[in-house]
Amino acid sequence: MSEAVKNLVNNDLADVMFNRHSVRQFDPNVKIGRDELQKMIAEAATAPSACNLQSWHFVVVDTPEAKAKFKQAVMKFNYPQVDSASAIVFIAGDTQSHYVYRDVWNKVYEDGNITKERLDQILGTFLPLYENATPDFLKFDATIDCSVVGMQLLLVARAHGYDANAFSGIDFEKMIPTLGLDPKRYVPVMGIAIGKAAQEPLHTTRYDAKTQTDFLA
Amino acid sequence: MSEAVKNLVNNDLADVMFNRHSVRQFDPNVKIGRDELQKMIAEAATAPSACNLQSWHFVVVDTPEAKAKFKQAVMKFNYPQVDSASAIVFIAGDTQSHYVYRDVWNKVYEDGNITKERLDQILGTFLPLYENATPDFLKFDATIDCSVVGMQLLLVARAHGYDANAFSGIDFEKMIPTLGLDPKRYVPVMGIAIGKAAQEPLHTTRYDAKTQTDFLA
């Protein structure tokens, strides 16, 4: 059994994904150790990211003091998850992740994983895009990275035997300073509350996906 | 075995998630039927969305004619995936999804799944936010929804025995009109190329997640 599987309590993809629901009321007595939280973040961070820049940053909120501070930048509607969760992982977008773009891809080349021609193509195509990008594009790019890693964290939490809830009902101005991060570098994206469900969550339905799908002629 | 599991070729979460890599070269001879594509989209759409508004729209590109049209709005760097994939699912954000907000949540109440008090709280908290939202916020909100459903589609593709690649290297002005969608309503987010890998993809490494994690004091 691979190292990764040993960490998982539930390796059943269909159950983890299709029986996932947003839990907003957790058992407040359940603690999750920081080692396990860090492991879950690392597992979630196997998600893809634009140019493998991993434009995400995680702030864990898992003490009463941290929760009190954190709630200053959270909408009241989301207090139940924050109060009862074992931990919240807030995911912020890093709009300066491309500063190390050259190092990241030079290393891939030095490790012999891509050709010089491919390295030049990658550096020639995307690095100029990032170096000349508008703040809006860098926020958009980082928002995508943070959302895909957030989706994996929701699934990884279930695979570790917990439930979770993603929320963006926050104060977008206050959040980054509240977390002690640099507002010039980081943008707020979403919080993921993690813990053991204390009650059966609301099972929402979905539109028929066919009504949201076109086939390009 | 649940209905969902029957569709899956690979229900091993750890393998699907941790052994996933971005494939850019597919076997061009492999076809994926539209029924199976539609099923994969429906399975991916079990993803969460802000207020369950499902602010995503899917356009499938799976014929030579559609690919030729689609490539007019794709960066050359991503032509290999487009040319060789069995299909591309382009995910666009729906910035008008909240127009049906009241209907969505009234139905949840009429189905007896939430109390009147909860309905009033939901409608009172978020509907005004959406009705007064800036275009930027609606784009941000839809981008998150499209990214989480995109992440699930990457995993669902592997669970169906395929591989996939997410890309946003596109022409952001041209894409929506090229897909025949209303640019006043939809915003481009990402394409997901799906097929059978024709060669072993590049295995990228990740930063140590501990270096990207803080614990709020």
Swiss-Prot record, chains A, B:
Pathway: Lipid metabolism; fatty acid metabolism. It comes from the Bacteria. The keyword S-adenosyl-L-methionine does not apply. It catalyses: 10-oxo-(11E)-octadecenoate + NADH + H(+) = 10-oxooctadecanoate + NAD(+). Keywords: Detoxification, Flavoprotein, FMN, NAD, Nucleotide-binding, Oxidoreductase. Changing C51A: 38% of wild-type catalytic activity. GO terms for molecular function: nucleotide binding; oxidoreductase activity. Homodimer. Belongs to the nitroreductase family. Is involved in a saturation metabolic pathway of polyunsaturated fatty acids, that detoxifies unsaturated fatty acids and generates hydroxy fatty acids, oxo fatty acids, conjugated fatty acids such as conjugated linoleic acids (CLAs), and partially saturated trans-fatty acids as intermediates. CLA-ER catalyzes the saturation of the carbon-carbon double bond in 10-oxo-(11E)-octadecenoate to produce 10-oxooctadecanoate, during linoleate metabolism. This is CLA biosynthesis enone reductase. It comes from Lactiplantibacillus plantarum (Lactobacillus plantarum). The gene is cla-er.
